[in-house]
């Protein structure tokens, strides 16, 4: 093979590659096959690189001719590949738009409305009833310290509620509140009597999960501080609330004990032929008022608390508290 024949062969190879590559690029029907073709043509081990590797057989004066021709072909092929890629992308987009096109004349598919959770509706109903009695809504943090959760409420250090088996303790003297009573303390710190508040919220206790207990549940507490309040005002408020919520169910008060109220009582309603405890209440202990700088000789008050889950279960005839937390649509769709 002469040097001139080598030059002619390389030139013919470039021309043949140009025609064949242009045809193959046009026939590529997807981006993957186009990318594979690009590698075959222009990759490090592609056909153009192999032709350029044969330039060693040429004279020094002939190599620039083949080099220029090869670079021109490379640029042409890159342009053809880019144009084809853009065409394929546009085709994909057009197909996607066509597949997602909405027929505005088609009848709509109905979307079922969701339901408010029974715990939420029960909480709102309870709060609304007390707001109707002149109470204002107050809320507080779920992470509390020992003072607000225990000490300010006259709960002694040896009280069982402070035990680790009953309370979720965190670091730095913090804990997950075991009741919403700390909201009462925070309110009295910032508001002078008279006050009437209702405090809904989530609370935490280390209870084993069963049909009537959960480590996370919801409470609503009420507090009234004013001049001349006594147990008859407490009883009248509780009775008015229970009648508005349950109707004419029988109600009874039983003497009880809470560290922050004196006297204290538990309230039962008759449900399904049995007495069911639904509230705890009592007159605010004077020592609690004194600790907050409130004169117990002038001011008196009462507090009451209830578990939202129990009210919800009685109201809707639910026999297991766990049903309220399972997110079972078959259950929730009943409300």
Swiss-Prot record:
- Primary residence: cytoplasm
- Record-listed E.C. numbers: 6.1.1.20
Q: Where is the signal peptide?
A: none
From the Swiss-Prot or TrEMBL record, state where the protein is found.
Answer: Cytoplasm
The entry's Mg(2+)-binding residues are 262
Select a single GO molecular function from the record's annotations and give it: tRNA binding
Q: Which GO terms describe its biological process?
A: phenylalanyl-tRNA aminoacylation
List the record's Gene Ontology CC terms alphabetically.
cytoplasm
Tell me yes or no: is Nucleotide-binding among this UniProt entry's keywords.
yes
Keyword annotations for this protein? Answer: Aminoacyl-tRNA synthetase, ATP-binding, Cytoplasm, Ligase, Magnesium, Metal-binding, Nucleotide-binding, Protein biosynthesis
What SUPFAM superfamilies does its record include? Class II aaRS and biotin synthetases, tRNA-binding arm
Requisite cofactors: Mg(2+)
Can you tell which superkingdom this protein's organism belongs to?
A: Bacteria
Assembly: Tetramer of two alpha and two beta subunits.
Indicate the family of this protein.
Belongs to the class-II aminoacyl-tRNA synthetase family. Phe-tRNA synthetase alpha subunit type 1 subfamily.
Q: Which PANTHER family match?
A: PHENYLALANINE--TRNA LIGASE, MITOCHONDRIAL, PHENYLALANYL-TRNA SYNTHETASE
Q: What is this protein called?
A: Phenylalanine--tRNA ligase alpha subunit
Q: Which organism is it from?
A: Prochlorococcus marinus (strain SARG / CCMP1375 / SS120)
């Amino acid at each position: 093979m002469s040097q001139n024949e080598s030059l002619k062969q390389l030139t013919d190879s470039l021309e043949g590659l140009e025609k064949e590559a242009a045809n193959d690029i046009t026939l590529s029907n997807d981006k993957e096959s186009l990318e594979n073709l690009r590698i075959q043509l222009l990759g490090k081990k592609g056909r153009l690189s192999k032709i350029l590797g044969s330039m060693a057989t040429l004279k020094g004066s002939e190599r620039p001719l083949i080099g220029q021709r090869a670079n021109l072909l490379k640029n042409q092929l890159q342009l053809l590949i880019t144009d084809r890629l853009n065409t394929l992308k546009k085709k994909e987009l057009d197909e996607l738009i066509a597949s997602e096109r909405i027929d505005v004349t088609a009848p709509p598919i109905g979307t079922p409305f969701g339901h408010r959770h029974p715990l939420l509706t029960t909480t709102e109903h309870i709060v609304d009833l007390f707001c109707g009695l002149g109470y204002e809504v107050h809320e507080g943090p779920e992470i509390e310290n020992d003072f607000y959760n225990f000490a300010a409420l006259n709960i002694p250090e040896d009280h069982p509620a402070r035990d680790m088996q009953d309370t979720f303790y965190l670091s730095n003297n913090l804990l997950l509140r075991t009741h919403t009573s700390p909201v009462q303390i925070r309110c009295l710190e910032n508001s002078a009597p008279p006050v009437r508040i209702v405090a809904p919220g989530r609370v935490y206790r280390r209870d084993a999960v069963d049909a009537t207990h959960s480590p996370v549940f919801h409470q609503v507490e009420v507090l009234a501080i004013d001049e001349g309040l006594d147990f008859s005002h407490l009883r009248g408020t509780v009775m008015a609330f229970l009648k508005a919520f349950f109707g004419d169910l029988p109600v009874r008060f039983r003497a009880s004990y809470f560290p922050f109220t004196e006297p204290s009582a538990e309230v039962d309603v008759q449900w399904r032929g049995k007495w069911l405890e639904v509230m705890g209440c009592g007159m605010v202990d004077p020592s609690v008022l004194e600790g907050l700088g409130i004169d117990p000789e002038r001011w008196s008050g009462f507090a009451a608390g209830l578990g939202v889950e129990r009210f919800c279960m009685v109201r809707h005839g639910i026999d297991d508290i766990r049903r309220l937390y399972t997110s079972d649509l078959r259950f929730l769709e009943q409300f």
